[in-house]
Amino acid sequence: MKINISLLWMAAICLLISGCSNYRELNELGVIIGMGIDHNDDPKNPYKVTYQVINPSGLAQTSTSGGKGLAVINYTVTAKTIVEAFARASAIIPRENNISHLSLIIIGEELARNGIDLLYDSVDRGKNQRVSVPIFIARGKTAEYLFGVIEPLEITPGKNIITTTKSEQSDYGSTNEVLLYETISALTSEGKDVSLPGISIRNDSKEAKQLSNFETTSPAYIEAKGLALFRKGKMVRWLDGETARAAQFVTSEINRTDVVIPCSEKGNVTITVIRAKSKMKTKIHHEKPVIQTSLNVMGEMMETSCDLDMSNPKLLKEFERKMENDLKKQIKRTISIAQKEKSDIFGFGDALSRTNPDYWRLHKKNWDNLFSDAEISMKVNVDIINSGMRMEPYKSK
């Protein structure tokens, strides 16, 4: 009898503890998927924070054929701190705020130039915050403005930004996705500075934030554009095009890209890079750091506008040497820019701390100046493994 009573008590307790006391219906939550942080001119409330919240009814309309309901709603507040902004947002978001599904953070360029090192404490400290969220810099605009652009192809602006950046990274390589924990690691590192991808608006107009942006064949849209260089938590300049891509070559962030080299006065050859791996070594010479970098590239010839026989192995070797020289010039130019800005976005200081810990311990406080004057040597090796499906070029009659 006692055993039966005990079993009943255990069953009752199991029923009680299996309940979800903190359960919430989706229509009771304000699911925040994007956060934008801008500088605010009011010194009492220096931050302007925009939250992009999922609109379930608009999402359903957008998913159906011909639906034009907005899938997201933006709410903007000003505050002294990021945490206070989240609390103030509860006064205007008509549902319980839920930030656990945050998918990206955008920082306005003005705020980035003022400094971002203090922002991440609140973002990283929150118990519901994921540290695998990508970070972007709004180029020439505010984060609030970019979140307001109505994208014709994607349901939400946030998703469009992420997919556009990933596409650019996989096909050209001048930008890359940088996550929150990687940014925090670089901000707290004594031997590496932060670099973050930029996003901008192409075909910007008054209609960019209107539903009429759906109704044109040349709409305003968001594009991945450039790499923002930081020094000690403050943005100092932009890198663009080949210069930005060269930085990704140094840090082995290139997945695929196309390199165009001349083959005549008017003709060019396009080499598609299918693999790129870099290594860096550091040493001390006469009490000064010497940085040695090497880059190994594998590529395929994908296009030529020159009348050349690509079956000739000597010709392929010639293109390999030309591509090596071009990449070497681009990388040296990029490193030179970074040295001028005293922004070690490559992590040369971290490499030096591992190979020469005693020297690093004595000079790490002065690394920005040492990096600026450091000797850099660059070695590039290119292997063109094939010339595509055709050896001879097409000739017009």
Q: Can you name each region flagged by the protein language model?
A:
Residues 2-9, 14-397:
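Membrane-proximal alpha-helical signals and transmembrane carboxylates
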